[in-house]
Amino acid sequence: MAISTGLFLLLGLLGQPWAGAAADSQAVVCEGTACYTAHWGKLSAAEAQHRCNENGGNLATVKSEEEARHVQQALTQLLKTKAPLEAKMGKFWIGLQREKGNCTYHDLPMRGFSWVGGGEDTAYSNWYKASKSSCIFKRCVSLILDLSLTPHPSHLPKWHESPCGTPEAPGNSIEGFLCKFNFKGMCRPLALGGPGRVTYTTPFQATTSSLEAVPFASVANVACGDEAKSETHYFLCNEKTPGIFHWGSSGPLCVSPKFGCSFNNGGCQQDCFEGGDGSFRCGCRPGFRLLDDLVTCASRNPCSSNPCTGGGMCHSVPLSENYTCRCPSGYQLDSSQVHCVDIDECQDSPCAQDCVNTLGSFHCECWVGYQPSGPKEEACEDVDECAAANSPCAQGCINTDGSFYCSCKEGYIVSGEDSTQCEDIDECSDARGNPCDSLCFNTDGSFRCGCPPGWELAPNGVFCSRGTVFSELPARPPQKEDNDDRKESTMPPTEMPSSPSGSKDVSNRAQTTGLFVQSDIPTASVPLEIEIPSEVSDVWFELGTYLPTTSGHSKPTHEDSVSAHSDTDGQNLLLFYILGTVVAISLLLVLALGILIYHKRRAKKEEIKEKKPQNAADSYSWVPERAESQAPENQYSPTPGTDC
């Protein structure tokens, strides 16, 4: 049989090993439009990918359960080459990796990993255990299986992630890797009508005699007869018409009149018919037709072989051998026109906020604080958190787009870790000063002012003025049944000075004793429950209702409204105190100035006196005359009783 020059050149190329081609043993499985090879070798993931690239492939993908079975078949063949093996777990690299910095997404099937050969994520996964959540290092995936057991179709190899390894340390339990090679089509294996042997050499340097499908551009070496008298023929798998691949041969190979149809059905795919002279021919069953190779049968219905993949449906063209593929909703045909791929609807931005693409469909998601709306839930509307029966805020709640915030009544501030609680403001401890003239008592959301004995609370509820001192406290009037009034009249614990300006502290804190504080001058006083300490039993308190303003100071309530001249009396009293203080300070300054002038003059006189010159006479003094006249008398007077 003649062979073209191009075929000889191809054979020459195939006869030379490719640079870097794997010299290790391997197993090959071809199906559909791809071939899978399994290899022994303790390599890092990067080295394994390089070995696959050298022959035009990539580390294998496992995008479906069907593809997982093809990979398992390759591993089964590979394990037979070294049987028996010891019982241990072995790992084989596949083309699933996660780059450094890409974190794990446990809610997705792929968990943030992607295929090195490209392609979209798929819904299929078969993880051995939970993935590491660390994003610091690159991670790679291998198939893990017990090397001593024959892989079972119901137990597909699990995915195991680990560090990608280095040439010096390829990884723990790494035994090999799997490659995948894609082709535009496949040829059927050559069928022999008599004794002989067929050896296939693939474009990725695999040599085997057992392939269920032979990839495009492979060469078949056919040796007919026994080894001593063998006849060799070479055939090339090529594409006759778009989508149709064959070897370019006609009739069965290695036919022998001695065997006829009894040997391998004469090499025919379906029926074999023998002639009277020892010859035979191939035929097809009803509904099929014999192809040009005179061996293979093809259905007259082009859709009988289900050429459409990816969920596509085949539709034959009437009175023709042609067909078309149609995809389900959410899918479209790729460039081959026979495979359906998912449509990414999110590229058209159909959602108001976030869009999540799924296989054959998509769904919209809303941000926190929003909820889906619209007929297809493609829109998002704000969630009114404040409208709920259980408002998240202790007091006021203000809704905003996608969120909310809490507010508090006057006299309170927002508090809590989530800023939903309200805490009372202690106006009496304000760093800017006491809002009262004398005593200050904090209450929930407000405060009250009081005065020491002999003083009365001014109508404005802040200042204290001289008033009538009562010798005993009147009894407390009956309590009102209104809970709000009762709450206002209760005095919280506080420290109370016994005089205006806080000159003396009272250490005892206010307790509920049932006392009623009042004055004979109309004030804003209200019933108040406080404790009068035993050591200061003569202390008298005059308290008035007082509410804080936004500036931190206070203003009287409507109960404290009085005439304008009453406020003026309090102000005049304060002015009197201020003027008296100024006069006293001025007198002290005048006195200090006079003392200073006196001391300066005295010092100046002493300085002049020290500088005055002295004469010699200043060191002598005159003897009194009386002393001179008496000296002779005292010196020479005779002694009584003597003659002198």
Curated annotation (Swiss-Prot):
Q: Which cysteines are joined by disulfide bonds?
A: 140-164, 261-272, 268-282, 284-297, 303-314, 308-325, 327-340, 346-355, 351-364, 366-380, 386-397, 393-406, 408-422, 428-440, 436-449, 451-464
| Top-level taxonomic group | Eukaryota
Q: Which positions does the record annotate as the modified residue Phosphoserine?
A: 619
Under the heading Pfam families, the entry gives: cEGF, EGF_CA, Lectin_C
In the record, biological process GO terms are:
angiogenesis; cell-cell adhesion
Membrane association type:
Single-pass type I membrane protein
Which residues are sugar-modified?
102, 322
Q: Which PROSITE patterns match?
A: ASX_HYDROXYL, C_TYPE_LECTIN_2, EGF_2, EGF_3, EGF_CA
Keywords from UniProt, A to Z, are:
Cell adhesion, Cell membrane, Disulfide bond, EGF-like domain, Glycoprotein, Lectin, Membrane, Phosphoprotein, Receptor, Repeat, Signal, Transmembrane, Transmembrane helix
**Gene3D superfamilies documented for this protein:** Laminin, Mannose-Binding Protein A, subunit A
Per the record, the major location class is membrane
Phenotype when the gene is knocked out: Homozygous CD93-deficient mice are viable and fertile under specific pathogen-free conditions. However, they are defective in the clearance of apoptotic cells in vivo. In addition, CD93 deficiency results in metastatic dissemination by impairing the vessel integrity in a VEGFR2-dependent manner. In the postischemic brain tissue, CD93 deficiency leads to increased inflammatory cell infiltration.
Q: How is it modified after translation?
A: N- and O-glycosylated.
Biased composition regions of type Polar residues, renumbered to the chain: 631-644
As stated in the Swiss-Prot or TrEMBL entry, residues carrying the post-translational modification Phosphotyrosine are 620, 636
Annotated protein name in UniProt: Complement component C1q receptor
Name the gene behind this protein: Cd93
